């Protein structure tokens, strides 16, 4: 039996939905590194990463605090994304032997001076967490969930210390976590004698260690030795942080066999328990899309069938003059807007951001940008932004040529430099603030130079290549002729005033994404993993459709009011959703974050301005192209003498 077109479509639609369902229901990813097999007794080297805090958002090098240092500190080779995230991966004194439990090992003994005491206390006040890595797995603290269930969750890193008071005293003291109890989970290969690491947990403790006589080569502690089985007892005295005090850093390690396979070892870190919220968000957004789709369908039916057929049947000039609405402005609707060059720049930049976002999400859906590939997401976004410059140049030049613009080189330079120039200016100010705080989040000179090389050496030339290709193409022709004398725009009702209609237009696109936005902001500012790109991709598609449809609907109402200045209005209508995004970021700052430092607050709002600006350019471009297609469609269907 011959397969029909309809059945073919249903087959491919089913295939697509099956793939999306799999992507949504599973933490689907490709591990970023090849598995390593360990034999019993093989050395395991723990690496240390940055100190991080959700209260300050300022990462610091692990050895900024007076922790135990190896004889020579070696920096791990970091990719571009890791450097931009503030990661500083280095070697440490913590070494294990595979499958060999070690009850107590002494790391070092340090004496606190004024500076180190001050630094420890500041980091305890700001709730800093120390981060470590073993076989590319970050260390985590196992916690009971707060919802009362028996399930557990992972907290990334461990607290530097805590504040408390002795029994019978109200004076608050600072205590440091100087003893780390590590637990390494492994999965044994049944065919060979090797094992693979599938988990890395830590339980931090504060212990005031005691010893009779300190032997640097073989220190013997009375509170901790190789025969100790249970270190932590009810009467253990915690280690206080005070100038002049000695701190002995110790650790122990145990190994536990796990049923988790190496390919699934990241699942516990990526465990998401909010699927119902995401589905509710998507269903809610789809209802908005269906409502808007109905309106667009009615408009298209009316304009392309009823109105156009009636309009084409008009024979006398008197009948034509009696017509009102969008048909009357056909001689002005394609008149180039004010600041047409600037509009071309923003549309070209929006295409660049759209291409970067789409390809990044496709790579993430396929599993190439998993958290195990540390810094991969950030690196991919930067590189894709650079290579999408060719589409920015092409889009802006095509529009510029249609507007009969001149000085194409100036136009191309604006496309290449305006948006990234504004971003770099804000970025430089923020980076200077981070430098002033001596944070490892400050971008080093070498990385900054590499970013400039990517911008000037690859992105700018590609914008010129795209612009050259665009200008070589014949100009886009208007479906109707433009009158020499502009038509006067009649007085508009209050609800069609530009400010009101633009602000109204941004509500629905923002409403389509704001629940997913909460999870994205949480992952950025509360140091959590975000890896539900299946949901994000669906929300992105809904955002595209919502921006397009709301712009088309409001553009139609505008043309019916005989206002033909739709070019910038279309861009700003969808782009105004960024205004609500920034308002939401203010709400999020005051309700979800505990940032108290001025510098940290400036960093937050600086980065949110960058995100909101990029969102404005992206959504504005989507709305503009939808309206551009709509206007050309309806006026190309009308016969004009």
From Swiss-Prot:
Lumenal compartment segments: 28-278, 370-374, 437-444, 521-531, 591-597
Cytoplasmic compartment spans: 300-348, 396-415, 466-499, 553-569, 619-641
Entry membrane topology: Multi-pass membrane protein
Cleaved signal peptide residues: 1-27
Predominant location category: membrane
Regions that span the bilayer: 279-299, 349-369, 375-395, 416-436, 445-465, 500-520, 532-552, 570-590, 598-618
GO CC annotations on file: cytoplasm; endosome; endosome membrane; Golgi apparatus; Golgi membrane; Golgi trans cisterna; nucleus; plant-type vacuole
Family statement drawn from the similarity comment of this UniProt entry: Belongs to the nonaspanin (TM9SF) (TC 9.A.2) family.
Function recorded in the entry: May play a role as effector of cellular copper homeostasis.
Name of the protein in its database record: Transmembrane 9 superfamily member 7
Originating species: Arabidopsis thaliana
Name of the coding gene: TMN7
């Amino acid at each position: 039996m011959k397969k029909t077109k309809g059945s073919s479509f249903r087959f491919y639609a089913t295939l697509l939905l099956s793939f999306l369902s799999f992507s949504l229901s599973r933490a689907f990813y490709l591990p970023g590194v090849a598995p390593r097999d360990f034999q019993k007794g093989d050395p395991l080297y723990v690496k240390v990463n940055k100190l991080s805090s959700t209260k300050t958002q300022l990462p610091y090098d692990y050895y900024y605090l007076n922790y135990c240092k190896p004889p020579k500190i070696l920096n791990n080779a970091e990719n571009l994304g890791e450097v931009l995230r503030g990661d500083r991966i280095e070697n440490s004194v913590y070494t294990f032997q595979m499958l060999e439990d070690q009850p107590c090992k002494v790391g070092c003994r340090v004496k606190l001076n004024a500076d180190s005491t001050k630094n420890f206390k500041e980091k305890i006040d700001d709730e800093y967490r120390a981060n470590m890595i073993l076989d590319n797995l970050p260390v985590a603290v196992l916690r009971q969930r707060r919802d009362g269930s028996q399930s557990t969750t992972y907290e990334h890193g461990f607290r530097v210390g805590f504040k408390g008071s002795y029994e019978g005293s109200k004076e608050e003291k600072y205590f440091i976590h100087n003893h780390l109890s590590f637990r390494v989970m492994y999965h044994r290969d049944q065919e060979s004698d090797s094992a693979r690491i599938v988990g890395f947990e830590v339980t931090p403790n504060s212990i005031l260690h005691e010893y009779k006589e300190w032997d640097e080569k073989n220190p013997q502690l009375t509170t901790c030795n190789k025969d100790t089985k249970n270190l932590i007892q009810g009467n253990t005295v915690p280690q206080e942080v005070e100038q002049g005090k000695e701190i002995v850093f110790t650790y122990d390690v145990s190994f536990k066999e796990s049923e988790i396979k190496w390919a699934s070892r990241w699942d516990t870190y990526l465990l998401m328990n909010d699927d119902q919220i995401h589905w509710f968000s998507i269903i809610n957004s789809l209802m908005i899309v269906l409502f808007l789709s109905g309106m667009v369908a009615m408009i298209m039916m009316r304009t392309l069938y009823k109105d156009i057929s009636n309009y084409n049947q008009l024979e006398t000039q008197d009948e034509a003059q009696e017509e009102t609405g969008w048909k009357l402005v056909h001689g002005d609707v394609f008149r180039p807007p004010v600041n047409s060059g600037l509009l071309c720049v923003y549309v070209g930049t929006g295409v660049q951001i759209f291409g970067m976002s789409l390809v990044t999400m496709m790579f993430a859906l396929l599993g190439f940008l998993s958290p195990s590939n540390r810094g991969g997401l950030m690196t991919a976004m930067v590189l894709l932004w650079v290579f999408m410059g060719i589409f920015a140049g092409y889009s802006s030049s095509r529009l510029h040529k249609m507007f009969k613009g001149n000085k194409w080189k100036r136009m191309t330079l604006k496309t290449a430099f305006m948006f990234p120039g504004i971003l770099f200016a804000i970025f430089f100010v923020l980076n200077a603030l981070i430098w002033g705080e001596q944070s490892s989040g400050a971008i080093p000179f070498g990385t900054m130079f590499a970013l400039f090389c990517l911008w000037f050496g690859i992105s700018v030339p590609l914008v010129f290549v795209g612009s050259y290709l665009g200008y070589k193409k014949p100009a886009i022709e208007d479906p109707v002729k433009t009158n020499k004398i502009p038509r006067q725009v009649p007085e508009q009702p209050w609800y069609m005033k530009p400010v009101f209609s633009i602000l109204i237009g941004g509500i629905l696109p923002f409403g389509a994404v704001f629940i997913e936005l909460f999870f994205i902001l949480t992952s950025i500012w509360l140091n959590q993993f975000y890896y539900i790109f299946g949901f994000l991709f669906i929300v992105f598609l809904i955002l595209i459709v919502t921006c397009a449809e709301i712009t088309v609907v409001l553009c139609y109402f505008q043309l019916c009011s005989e206002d033909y200045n739709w070019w910038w209005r279309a861009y700003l209508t969808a782009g105004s959703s960024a205004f609500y995004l920034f308002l939401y970021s203010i709400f999020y700052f005051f309700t979800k974050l505990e940032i108290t430092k001025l510098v940290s607050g400036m960093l937050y709002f600086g980065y949110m301005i960058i995100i909101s600006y990029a969102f404005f350019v992206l959504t504005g471009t989507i709305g503009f192209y939808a309206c551009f297609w709509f206007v050309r469609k309806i006026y190309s269907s009308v016969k004009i003498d």
